[in-house]
Regions:
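Short, solvent-exposed loop/turn segments at secondary-structure junctions
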Residues: 40-41, 138-140, 176
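Core catalytic region of metal-dependent phosphoesterases/phosphodiesterases
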Residues: 6, 11-91, 190-193
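Divalent metal-coordination and catalytic microenvironments
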Residues: 8, 31, 36, 63, ...
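Short, conserved loop/helix-junction motifs that constitute active-site signature segments
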Residues: 50-55, 122-124, 159-162, 182
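Conserved acidic residues
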Residues: 29-31, 57, 126-129, 165
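Binuclear metal-dependent phosphoesterase catalytic core
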Residues: 18, 88-92, 109-110, 153-165, ...
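Active-site-proximal beta-strand elements of phosphoester/diester hydrolases
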Residues: 1-10, 93-102, 129-133, 186-191
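Conserved catalytic scaffold of divalent metal-dependent phosphoesterases
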Residues: 66-154
């Protein structure tokens, strides 16, 4: 499966144009958005409309610049957007699990609780793709400067325990476009213009 993931667009027309160009030049099966498509919900409806007009299935979560309720409502009223915050989606033998918002705490008790419920949804042989706005702690995705990590420890614990094939996150703009392997997982901050990844 070929995925084009993106995060932290923050209303940028240039970023949306680059995503559209990548869709035109690559055979993409799925779009994934890890949140913050706006600056505090400015121009929300228009941005969601543009994403919908890409005409490809798009799994999306809210970031810290959007409310869960508004993102869910706009996705439900679109043709191609699927809101996956705490609502996993199965595509073939892949299961996509999203958890939006946050990005400012080391711990997320609600994520711990919900991720346990998610694991009861998973079947033997499923390949898990995790989509969060907050990056996992102590990785190349949450480093602000040398030896200073600001990510979420509960998300990191989940990744270490479950070994998803891919974990997409955003929030930390300084680490946009960073991709690397952590054990069995591809960790990715896809940046606002997007990164193509094959799983």
């Amino acid at each position: 499966m070929k995925i084009l993931a993106f995060s932290d667009v923050h209303g940028s027309e240039k970023a949306l144009k680059r995503i559209k160009q990548k869709l035109a030049h690559e055979k993409i099966d799925l779009l994934i958005c890890a949140g913050d498509i706006t600056i505090f919900e400015q121009g929300y409806v228009g941005i969601v409309r543009k994403l919908d007009e890409f005409g490809i299935k798009t799994l999306i979560i809210h970031g810290n610049h959007e409310s869960r309720e508004t993102m869910k409502r706009l996705a439900e009223n679109s043709k191609n957007l699927i809101f996956i915050h705490k609502d996993p989606v199965r595509i073939g033998d892949y299961v996509f699990y999203g958890y939006g918002g946050g990005g400012f705490s080391f711990r997320e008790p609600d994520f711990v609780k919900d991720s346990k419920k998610f694991l009861s949804f998973v079947k033997r042989g499923d390949k898990i793709v995790l989509v969060t706005h907050a990056p996992p702690y102590n990785t190349k995705l949450d480093m602000l400067w040398e030896d200073h990590h600001c990510g979420n420890k509960d998300i990191k614990t989940f990744i270490d325990k479950v070994n998803p094939v891919l974990a997409v996150s955003g929030h930390i703009h300084e680490n946009a476009y960073v991709t690397y392997h952590h054990k069995k997982t591809i960790l990715l901050n896809p940046g606002p213009t997007g990164t193509v990844v094959k799983i």
